[in-house]
Amino acid sequence: MTETTSGRPLRADARRNYQRILGAAESVFAEQGADASLEEIARRAGVGSATLHRRFPSRRALLLAVFRDGIEALCDQARALTEKAEPGPALTSWLRALTAYTVSHRGLALLLLPAGVGLEPANQDDTCHAMLNAAGGQLLKQAHVAGAVRPDVSLADLLTLVNAISLATEADGNPRTADRLLVMALNGVHPLP
């Protein structure tokens, strides 16, 4: 994200503006959620509204940039778990990490929705939702093969569950509450004896 659309590196001042916008956006989204004023973000970053909109043409694009590193880390964790852990516990561990991250980062829950739901449409390949589908899909597939999860449970079901818990607990922001709810819900996705 530090290159222009032509692939050339950003000028030093443009790179500084980009970083200031991301820093301000992270703070404002943490305080006010995904519906925070873009004008307030530009003001806190010390840039004009046009500068913000030139670099981030939509709210979704700005949210994606703010949360991308964390989502990539969660995707890396999913890939590592597919290689090292038992399928059922691996899936549970990843969903718990995803829930904790989502609850502690206001605004992220909306970004986890498929493009066009909750925020303006975006390129599906460019969304956190698509990244998580790719990473979590393998964990779920392994859990299905191992019989650790009911066959009718989809990744969309699990991401919707994480999203609903995150949105429901966003006001108190307590990851323990969200984790407790997730564990209760996950007990329902295990196969019946």
Language-model segment annotations:
Residues 46-56:
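Short hydrophobic/aromatic patch on the recognition helix
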Residues 68-75:
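Short, basic, alpha-helical segments at the C-terminal edge of helix-turn-helix-like DNA-binding modules
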Residues 110-120:
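Short linear capping/connector segments at secondary-structure termini
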Residues 1-43, 61-64:
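Basic, helix-initiating cap at the start of DNA-binding domains
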Residues 124-128, 145-160, 171-177:
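All-alpha amphipathic helical-bundle segments outside canonical DNA-binding/catalytic cores
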